[in-house]
C-alpha cells in the first residue's frame, strides 16, 4: 500500500492523505456475500444514546467475513483483494475447490492467485489457519480465537499482529499489539501473518467533513458545556473545572482511573497488562 498526499489547494486538502488503493483489484463486492447493514448510530433499542459521537456517516453494505475459517482441509485460491468500508483492513475473496466463496481479512503479502488452507496440518505460510498448538514459537498471527471454534475475535485491525511466545500446559502465550501478554487455549485457531494495510495508521483525514463520512460526530469538551451537562461545565468564560481531578459526564474519575473489574474471569489469563 502507498499513501497519496494532497497539495494545499484548499484548507480541506492541506495535510490530507489517502490510500492509493494500489492493492485493490475490483470495486464491486460479491453480491452473495453482502447484505444491507442496519446501523445503530450509537443508539439502543429505545433510541437512547449509548455511545456518544456516532452517526451520520455514508451508507454501507456489509461484507460477510469468514472469521471462523471452518472449511477444514479444502484448498482455496485468492481471487481478489477488495476495499471494505466497515473496517480498516482490506478483505480477500477466496474461491474454494468445492465451488464456495468466502471473504477473509487480507494478510500482508498475500498475493492474487496464492493458495491458502484451514487445517491442523496446514504449513506455516501467510493466510493459512491452524490451531496454536501446531504453530512453532515466534509465529506471527492475527484473527485469534478466544474460545475454540468461536471464530477470531482478537487482532483484526489493519496492521495488527500478535506473536506466539510460549506454549505450556493447555495454553499458548501471545504478545498482543498493545503490549499485553495473555494466555489463550492452545486449541484456539489463528491465521498466520500480519493484517494488511499497515500504513492505515499514518493516514491524515485533513478536514472535519471526512470524519463525518466515517460516522464520527464532533466530540465536545466538557469544559465548554453548561454545568447541567457536565461536571467540568459552567463558570464565567474559561475557568478551571473546579474538581481535584477530571471527571466523566456522570461524575466518575477519568483519565487514568482503572475501570477494569477487579475480579474479572480473565484476570487469570493475563500475564502482563498492556502498556
From Swiss-Prot:
InterPro entries: NA-bd_OB-fold, Rib_uL2_dom2, Ribosomal_uL2, Ribosomal_uL2_bac/org-type, Ribosomal_uL2_C, Ribosomal_uL2_CS, Ribosomal_uL2_dom3, Ribosomal_uL2_RNA-bd_dom
Database matches in SMART domains: Ribosomal_L2 (SM01383), Ribosomal_L2_C (SM01382)
Swiss-Prot/TrEMBL keywords: Chloroplast, Plastid, Ribonucleoprotein, Ribosomal protein
Chain intervals for the UniProt region annotation (Disordered): 28-53
Keyword Chloroplast: yes
Any one GO MF annotation of this record: transferase activity
Disulfide bridge partners, by residue number: none
Chloroplast is among the record's keywords: yes
Major subcellular site: plastid
GO biological process, one term: mitochondrial translation
Superkingdom: Eukaryota
Location of the protein in the cell: Plastid, Chloroplast
GO CC annotations, alphabetized: chloroplast; mitochondrial large ribosomal subunit
Coiled-coil intervals: none
Pfam families per the UniProt record, alphabetical: Ribosomal_L2, Ribosomal_L2_C
Subunit structure, interactors included: Part of the 50S ribosomal subunit.
HAMAP family named among the record's database cross-references: Ribosomal_uL2_B (MF_01320_B)
Family stated for the protein in its record: Belongs to the universal ribosomal protein uL2 family.
Database matches in PANTHER family: LARGE RIBOSOMAL SUBUNIT PROTEIN UL2M (PTHR13691:SF5), RIBOSOMAL PROTEIN L2 (PTHR13691)
Designated name of the protein: Large ribosomal subunit protein uL2c
